[in-house]
UniProtKB/Swiss-Prot annotation:
Protein's UniProt name: Sorting nexin-41
Span list, region Disordered: 1-31, 81-115, 429-498
A single BP term in Gene Ontology: autophagy of mitochondrion
Encoding gene, per UniProt annotation: SNX41
Organism: Yarrowia lipolytica (strain CLIB 122 / E 150) (Yeast)
Binding site for a 1,2-diacyl-sn-glycero-3-phospho-(1D-myo-inositol-3-phosphate): R153, S155, K179, R202
Skewed-composition ranges (Polar residues): 84-101, 440-454
Domain description: The PX domain binds phosphatidylinositol 3-phosphate which is necessary for peripheral membrane localization to the perivacuolar punctate structures.
Function per UniProt: May be required for cytoplasm to vacuole transport (Cvt) and pexophagy.
One Gene Ontology MF term: phosphatidylinositol-3-phosphate binding
Family in the record: Belongs to the sorting nexin family.
């Protein structure tokens, strides 16, 4: 038995590539939100891609005053991205520090009806550049919860989400808006950091993220989330204090629920399975059906992400770009008609041409606003939906690795038991041989010569020094070290170590069996919640998409009918 096998309880079993997950930390004193300071843990994992419409949605500036009513916020499925009381009343695009309040109100209305959280609806009221401790500066987002405000950076939102995924590995933690691409930083790093459209997009989506977290009892009751909203809490201290600082380095070597408090010594014996491993098909038993259910859920999430992120989103983005181009053409055409009206000597004809030019200008403004509202009410939630699919796949991946962990532990335990049986059998055979030799010697007795005199002692033979190659002393030493001088002692030592490893694996198997039951129940429950939420969000997106186009078409129809009446009255 090699040194590796001596020290590794999983040696001799199926060895698969290992995958690890890293840690972060969490924090200090009581929060102003500490209405419930109990740590409630439950689950989630990493995030995935998905594009954004914020660029196309705001490539054109603000508008003048069109009177299109937006999607009704009184609906039970009120869209968290819908601007609630927002109308197609063309106000200029809000500055970084003065966002359109109606978007925040709509989000709050949705989250208030969807949750019984003790935390009031959350708003991000502004985004400002801050120069504290640096000459270059950074953007901070002002979060308002009731009468209390706190400023946080994007990187702090990012670390919050990472921490939540480690604390709740079986929970579908909402995604946050994407980072800048490497290309953006390479081309114009300063512009990438301070891009107004990106900041406004992040402001809206970070508010959606916080309110979605607020709707999840596990997160809203979590002290880490409450301290994130506490203006008196230092976030760096939160990340370096319990419960975050007590989270294990590898989430797979911890229980699925409350991993910062419920870790046992047995968890340290668990293997880290490959992320690409396949759970064995157990046929028609209950466990087999459950594995089939999760495999189908993973397949569906992957297909949904491909349909949304790789298909629908790209096409919708192209359409928004075309609307943007058309709006620009309408603006130019309206100006040409107005110039033409000034050239007309007939005042009646000049007024008619000017009326047509005004209709075209109105069409430009309406199309401009359509692009912006489609980006906010349809594009942004669509991109978030693609990100959610990636989050679901990450949670399912964690659950699958927990199932693989159980299989690996069971296989390793069985292999070690076979090894122990083999060693014990060899030890028993060796003992029988030694006993037989002992009996043979005792039966023969000491031999004597006929004269009764002891024979003269012959010189003792030289003790063999083992394997030798003349002139190669170092090589001789290496070979001699490899040769087992006392195989019986080595075998007994191997038996002792194998028994110890079997004891560790039996403990590991027990916690692995408990963990997979908890993980399966928790993931399945959260998948049901997420599916209902996704269905409601999809209805909101479709309704918003239809409403934006209907209001845009009605506004244009009224404008062109007014122009037609002017022309026909000539």
């Amino acid at each position: 038995m090699s040194d590796f096998e001596d020290n590794n309880p999983f040696a001799g079993a199926d060895r698969r590539d290992s995958v690890s997950s890293d840690a972060t930390d969490d924090g200090p004193s009581a929060s102003f939100l500490a209405t419930n300071t109990t740590n409630d843990f439950g689950g989630a994992s990493f995030m995935a891609g998905g594009g954004s419409f914020y660029g196309a949605a705001s490539q054109i500036g603000g508008l003048g005053g069109m009177g299109m009513s937006a999607y009704d916020p009184e609906s039970a499925l009120a869209n968290p991205f819908d601007d609630g009381s927002n109308s197609f009343s063309a106000t200029p695009t809000a500055s970084i520090t003065n966002q359109n309040d109606t978007a925040h109100e709509a989000t709050n209305e949705r989250t208030t009806t969807a949750s019984q959280s003790n935390i009031p609806p959350i708003e991000i009221i502004e985004a400002n550049k801050n120069h504290e401790g640096t000459s270059r500066g950074f953007i901070t987002y002002t979060i308002r919860v009731g009468d209390v405000s706190v400023r946080r950076r994007y990187s702090e939102f990012e670390s919050l989400r990472t921490t939540l995924t480690r604390m709740f590995p079986t929970l579908i933690v909402p995604p946050i808006p994407e980072k800048h691409s490497i290309t953006d930083y390479a081309v114009a790093p300063t512009k990438a950091r301070e891009d107004k459209d990106m900041i406004e997009h992040r402001q809206r989506m970070l508010q959606v993220f916080l309110n979605r977290c607020r709707n999840l009892p596990q997160i809203s009751n979590c002290i880490v989330f409450q301290r994130f909203l506490d203006p008196h809490a230092s976030w760096s201290e939160v990340l370096n204090s319990p419960p975050v600082s007590t989270l294990p380095r590898y989430s797979l070597r911890a229980p699925p629920v409350d991993p910062s408090n419920n870790v046992t010594e047995a968890h340290s014996y668990l293997p880290i399975p490959s992320a690409n491993g396949v759970v064995r098909n157990r046929g028609g038993d209950e466990e087999g059906k459950q594995e089939a259910f999760f495999a189908e859920a993973e397949k569906t999430a992957k297909e949904y992400e491909a349909v949304i992120g790789g298909g629908l989103e790209k096409v919708a983005r192209r359409i928004l770009k075309r609307y943007t181009d058309i709006a620009g053409d309408y603006a130019e055409l309206g100006g040409r008609f107005n110039a033409l009206s000034l050239e007309e000597s007939d005042s009646r004809m000049a007024a008619t041409v000017e009326k047509v030019g005004q209709a075209i200008d109105s069409n430009y403004l309406a199309t401009n606003h359509l692009v912006r509202e489609l980006g906010r009410q349809f594009g942004e939630p669509l991109a978030e939906s693609a990100q959610f699919s990636g989050v679901v796949r990450s949670v399912l991946k964690y659950r699958k690795q927990k199932a693989l962990q159980l299989e690996l532990t069971s296989d390793s335990l069985e292999a070690k038991r076979v090894t122990l049986a083999s060693l014990e059998s060899a030890e028993a055979d060796s003992q029988r041989i030694n006993d037989a030799l002992g009996r043979t010697r005792s039966n023969n007795g000491p031999s004597t010569t006929n004269s009764g005199e002891q024979p003269s002692a012959s010189p003792a033979p030289k003790k063999s020094s083992g394997f030798k190659i003349p002139g190669l002393s170092s090589l001789n030493s290496a070979f001699n070290n490899m040769m087992d001088a006392d195989p019986e002692a080595s075998r007994r030592q191997g038996i002792g170590k194998t028994r110890e490893q079997i004891g560790q694996l039996e403990q590991a198997l027990e916690v692995a069996q408990k963990d997979i039951v908890v993980a399966n129940e928790s993931v399945e429950k959260d998948l049901e919640r997420f599916r209902a939420e996704r269905e409601a969000d999809l209805k909101c997106m479709i309704r918003a998409f239809l409403k934006c186009h209907i209001d845009w078409a009605k506004q244009n129809l009224d404008t062109w009918q007014s122009a037609q009446a002017e022309v026909e009255s000539m």
